[in-house]
């Protein structure tokens, strides 16, 4: 929402934990697979009511575990498993969100194509080479990870692969027309 000077009140919960708590565990080994930690704020996860209920139940169970058994050795493993459960649910819910984007928003693909067309129309390849995923994402005001995940969901391939195919097709067309690349 734009800032109109009125005070907003938000509610919810935040899951915070010391990195040492997960060091050497399955969670620490899987952290790189959770791309959503690198998304911009405008690429937030939008939960359905059912998804909110699922996460709230998990968090209630986690709070109960900490309140009643916190400090017990067996509790640490249960808490780690609950953290992993929250992370995996978030991955699932992002996958659903990407499917929704793919169904209802072909606009991102059109805009991606336009970014590539404009890049070559402006002859930026002469200075910068092949456009990068980071460049395309920034032109669309998206983080590279979010952009990559959306394109992967929409096209079944990475943005890098799509860019390579675009460049290859463009080069073939220029070679067939005897023009300079």
Where are the model-predicted features located?
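Regular secondary-structure segments
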Residues: 56-67, 113-120, 172-176
